[in-house]
Amino acid sequence: MSQKMAKEGPRLSKNQKFSEHFSIHCCPPFTFLNSKREIVDRKYSICKSGCFYQKKEEDWICCACQKTSRRATSPQRPKHQPAASPVVVRAPPAKPKSPLMPAKPRSPPRPAKPRSPSRTERQPRPRPEVRPPPAKQKPPQKSKQPARSSPLRGPGTSRGGSPTRAPRFW
């Protein structure tokens, strides 16, 4: 733990421009790794977040966590963590489901189940299509309101304004 902390440098401020200090080369995780999980292009390295920018020959900066770190063996450890964590998390829930469902040989019902939710998803889709027409009716109502207010203003001002209206209100 202490070794990793020592290798990682301070976080860069959001205002700092990466291009001014070092070249930016972002790559998705495992893009530049071969089957043996060895880095093919030494200009790239991988951190916990899955990507590094190159700062210097020995220093790297991550495009996600924005931490600088050295090439050492640290990039190899994070490679296993992101790949193993989702697999381990997904595997345990899958195992309890299989013993709970005694109908393992019945494969046809399983594909039918995903189809039924898709039908339920399709039903709400037409509903939003029906909603837009009422929205179109609202703008004409708004246009009527200013039309009503404008004639009221027009005659009031044309009648002389203050001298004519003053005796009426008083």
UniProtKB/Swiss-Prot annotation:
* Phosphoprotein listed as a keyword: yes
Q: Which organism is it from?
A: Mus musculus (Mouse)
Which residues pair up as cystines? none
- Comp. bias (Basic and acidic residues): 118-130
GO CC annotations?
A: cytosol; mitochondrion; myelin sheath; perinuclear region of cytoplasm
Segments for region (3 X 9 AA approximate tandem repeats): 93-115
Domain of life of the source: Eukaryota
What are the start and end residues of each sequence repeat? 93-101, 105-110, 111-115
Asked whether the keyword Phosphoprotein is assigned, the reply is: yes
This molecule's function is given as:
May play a role in compacting or stabilizing the myelin sheath possibly by binding the negatively charged acidic phospholipids of the cytoplasmic membrane.
GO MF term set: structural constituent of myelin sheath
Localization annotation: Cytoplasm, Perinuclear region
Q: Which UniProt keywords apply?
A: Cytoplasm, Phosphoprotein, Repeat
- In the record, Phosphoserine modifications are located at 85, 98, 107
Write out the biased-composition intervals (Low complexity).
Answer: 82-92, 138-151
What is the name attached to this protein's record?
Myelin-associated oligodendrocyte basic protein
Q: Where is this region: Disordered?
A: 69-170
